[in-house]
């Protein structure tokens, strides 16, 4: 290495490294700890540890690696068994789109889930048959990222699902973290919708269009006129809506969308058109809890704007709970996400692609209508379209320090290696 040379951050899930300095001086940073090494010093880097090299002078080194691949440490992009949920407003269409055996009344497909009563089950590789939660418990930092594991108590903090509507959904709201912890000992539920397909004149409701007091809200719920106070949005493929906890919302019929949300299944149903459930009984309403959870703030625009540029990783949402990028690709793209210290969930919404892991050479095919989980320790990968263009979503936790200007600049810039 020449003086001043720096390497990118590396993590080897199945390899232990030994560096022996023959000549010169080098700084080797292991999991954030800097180690200064000179002639005849050696340093050992365990598997699953991140390291960076910085040559302080011209340096000659001997580097050795030992492959230690075992079942316990094997990491790769994970696919999942179908996790389908019956809904009164569901139909056969979602299973048809995913080319699964046809089932009626299917409204949701939980693509990557850590919800305890409905976790994702791994379908491929070493860990096939295990739940995602079980593997995370075995290797929390390698799977989630060190920061994510520490901040979220070794639990997957987001859920990705598909929703397909054959009828209007109930009008509902979700609590924020404070209320959810207080009332249910769970996380709150902030979410984002990405519209994959919508029939002509389909719509969603998001937010209020007029300012209401809690008393006015209660009256409108009681007399069945609450719909008149909601902001109604006609939707088209590619539309994005951010729904922070507390924002009233509903999806109309004829919409297929991907939802990224916090790991929570708490819903307060406000209005359900007087419709019975699949059991023939009226579905429960939660008007009092909803009144406590609601944010009555009126906004001018509830639709997210973002650039949908071909062959770019377009940032459409960046929040403390999760970040999401939209990637329409004609050509292969490298995605080095190691610096985020986070897992990545890739969801294919159009066509199909290969996901190729650079450190392990593992490769999977990701088809339209399916998702994969990339562990944090191997989040340096290529997305390779198979035939024509492909469109995928990336969901992850942004753990990089973010100043105000970085948040603004990141809306417009993309680097094919490390991202802002």
Identify the function of each model-found stretch.
Residues 32-48, 230-242, 357-378:
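Short acidic-glycine-tyrosine-enriched beta hairpin
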Residues 14-26, 31, 136-139, 164-168, ...:
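Glycine- and acidic-residue-biased ligand/ion/polar-headgroup-sensing regions
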Residues 1-13, 169-181, 195-201, 320-339:
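Conserved short histidine dyad/triad with adjacent acidic residue
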Residues 68-212, 272-300, 324, 400, ...:
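Transition-metal
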Residues 268-340:
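C-terminal amphipathic alpha-helical segment
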Residues 2-4, 39-40, 46-48, 176, ...:
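Tight coil/turn sites that cap or link beta-strands
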Residues 220-269:
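Loop-centered beta-sheet repeat module
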Residues 47-71, 163-168, 177, 187, ...:
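Ligand-binding loop in jelly-roll beta-barrel domains
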């Amino acid at each position: 290495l020449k003086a001043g040379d720096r390497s990118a951050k590396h993590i080897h899930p199945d390899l232990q490294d030994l560096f022996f300095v023959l000549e010169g001086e080098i700084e080797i940073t292991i999991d954030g700890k800097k180690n200064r090494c000179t002639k005849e010093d050696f340093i050992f880097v365990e598997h699953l540890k991140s390291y960076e090299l910085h040559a302080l002078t011209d340096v000659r080194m001997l580097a050795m690696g030992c492959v230690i691949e075992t079942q316990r440490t094997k990491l790769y992009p994970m696919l999942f068994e179908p996790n389908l949920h019956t809904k009164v407003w569901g139909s056969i269409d979602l299973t048809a789109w995913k080319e699964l055996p046809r089932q009626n009344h299917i409204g949701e497909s939980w693509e990557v889930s850590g919800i305890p009563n409905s976790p994702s089950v791994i379908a491929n590789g070493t860990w096939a048959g295990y739940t995602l939660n079980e593997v995370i418990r075995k290797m929390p930092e390698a799977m989630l990222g060190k920061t994510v594991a520490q901040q979220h108590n070794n639990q997957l903090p987001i859920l990705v699902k598909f929703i397909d509507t054959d009828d209007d959904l109930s009008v509902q709201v979700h609590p924020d973290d404070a209320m959810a912890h207080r009332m249910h000992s769970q996380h709150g539920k902030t979410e984002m919708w990405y519209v994959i397909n919508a029939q002509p004149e389909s719509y969603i409701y998001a937010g209020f269009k007029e300012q209401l007091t809690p008393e006015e809200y209660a009256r409108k719920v009681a007399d069945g006129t609450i719909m008149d106070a909601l902001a109604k949005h006609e939707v088209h493929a590619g539309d994005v809506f951010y729904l922070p906890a507390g924002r009233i919302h509903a999806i109309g019929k004829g919409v297929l969308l991907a939802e990224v949300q916090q790991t929570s299944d708490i819903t307060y149903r406000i209005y359900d058109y007087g419709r019975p459930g699949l059991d023939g009984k009226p579905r429960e309403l939660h008007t009092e809890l909803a009144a406590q959870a609601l944010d009555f703030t009126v906004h001018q625009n509830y639709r997210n704007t973002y650039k949908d540029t071909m062959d770019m990783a377009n940032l459409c949402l960046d929040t403390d709970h999760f970040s999401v990028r939209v990637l329409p690709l004609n050509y292969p793209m490298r995605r080095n996400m190691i610096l985020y210290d986070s897992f990545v969930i890739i969801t294919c919404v159009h066509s199909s692609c290969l996901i190729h892991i650079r450190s392990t050479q593992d490769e999977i095919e990701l088809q339209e209508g399916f998702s994969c989980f990339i562990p944090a320790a191997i989040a340096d990968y290529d997305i390779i379209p198979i035939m024509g263009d492909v469109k995928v979503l990336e969901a992850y936790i942004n753990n990089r320090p973010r100043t105000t200007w970085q948040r603004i600049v990141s809306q417009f810039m993309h680097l094919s290696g490390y991202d802002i």
